[in-house]
Amino acid sequence: MTLINALKNNLSHSNVPFNHWIINNPLSEKAIDEIYSINFPEGKVIFDGTRAGDKTGDNLLSKLRIFIDKDNAEEYSELFGLVKEMQSKECTDFISNLINRDLKNSYVRLEVIADRDGFWLEPHCDIKEKLMSSILFVNRYGENENLGTDFYTPDLEVAKTLPYKNNTGYIFTSEENSWHGLEKKKIKKERRCLQLNYVTFETEWPVD
């Protein structure tokens, strides 16, 4: 129950520039091993400021994102364990109270991300279907800590950059001005992350 333990014991709050929570040590070392065990393909991709690389409709970055589903849950058992933690009533009750959102009848979505040099993410607010957004950073490659997510003011000025430190991350719920993204920065090898969401649309993982 690494995630739940971190939520209860290693969480801090900030409201600059919008409400969010910093979480420390949410992942076991075995889970981090699994995140790094995933082999993403090499090759040229086009970065367009979106997570999916889909401004042209081509979904250019789909191969650099792996969703944990029933087809790979056995292979990635530690990450599947994290899905089950998120499905549990203990976890949903805690996060629901934290972000003041009703997570009943929601679904868990979990994906491993491998951002390569050239990737950037334009400032945006998440879609309303994302009830909770969280990125957990894993940084075993010694990447610069400035590769964490950028949070913006309503005028789209960078207000703060969350440090890209291994086994740390953040949680927030979409608000009117919860602008976030990633400025264009140098990635030496790879910016690998784990994205956690509670969503209203159906996935294979309904909450308990």
Model regions and ranges:
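Non-heme Fe(II)/2-oxoglutarate
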Residues: L3-L98
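Catalytic core of non-heme Fe(II) oxygenases with the double-stranded beta-helix
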Residues: E75-Q87, C91-D208
